[in-house]
Amino acid sequence: MSIKVIVAGFKGRMGSTAVDMIKNDSELELAALLDPFAAEKEIDGVPVFTDKSDLVGLDAEVWVDFTIPKVAYENTHFALENGFRPVVGTTGFTQEQIADLMTLSADKKLGGLIAPNFAIGAVLLMEFAAKASKYFPDLEIIELHHDKKKDAPSGTAVKTAELIREARAYKKQGAADEEETLVGARGAEFDGFRIHSVRLPGLVAHQEVIFGAQGEGLTLRHDSYDRISFMSGVNLGIKEVVQREQLVYGLEHLL
């Protein structure tokens, strides 16, 4: 039997790519599409909604969310309250919001996934970076995205930094008497190292973690050249959350 899926934010680039992926998988079925700016009533027989409250009672199992940070938490909370298992690629959640959603999902016995990045290569980069940081504690993260991205740093960069913090002993990087002659030149500070965000047209999603040591350096990099790179992770997430009873943060928990 097919897994019935709602896609919130289907008008966006990630949402529309997810719709195409679901249509092309015989194990998945589009149950509904949601976007506040939609003018259509249905697309190829799939009902279209502009208000999530109209989805209460809908026969669906999974809620895929590619919306915007300011509504993603509310959407995910709504999904869990109404029996939909969330698979969320929207970034910008606080740690408190993630913890709240984990608690709610456990109470409801519903699986779910919030993933800063759905590309398998990006998840591997995070894992490799955490491992390398034990031996190369001096590092900087540079994330590069298209110029329409609303949050900075990216969710991928934040998740990478959190994994590094768990693996690396704290170290304040850089000169003790370092001074910025231009405010912000050294980027954002996280656990003693720096994160830099680049926003340019033509980019999709890219990240480097650069490590330095005496006489050597190590650079780990992942590039998503097309949004199709995220769909294997979204597909995996949809099929995994229906078998689980609590939300997880990070695709690595499903690999």
Curated annotation (Swiss-Prot):
Signal peptide: none annotated. One of its GO terms (cellular component) is cytosol. It catalyses: (S)-2,3,4,5-tetrahydrodipicolinate + NAD(+) + H2O = (2S,4S)-4-hydroxy-2,3,4,5-tetrahydrodipicolinate + NADH + H(+); (S)-2,3,4,5-tetrahydrodipicolinate + NADP(+) + H2O = (2S,4S)-4-hydroxy-2,3,4,5-tetrahydrodipicolinate + NADPH + H(+). The active site is at residues 145, 149. Keywords: Amino-acid biosynthesis, Cytoplasm, Diaminopimelate biosynthesis, Lysine biosynthesis, NAD, NADP, Oxidoreductase. (S)-2,3,4,5-tetrahydrodipicolinate binds at residues 146, 155-156. Pfam families: DapB_C, DapB_N. Catalyzes the conversion of 4-hydroxy-tetrahydrodipicolinate (HTPA) to tetrahydrodipicolinate. Belongs to the DapB family. This is 4-hydroxy-tetrahydrodipicolinate reductase. It comes from Streptococcus mutans serotype c (strain ATCC 700610 / UA159). The lineage of its organism: Bacteria, Bacillati, Bacillota, Bacilli, Lactobacillales.
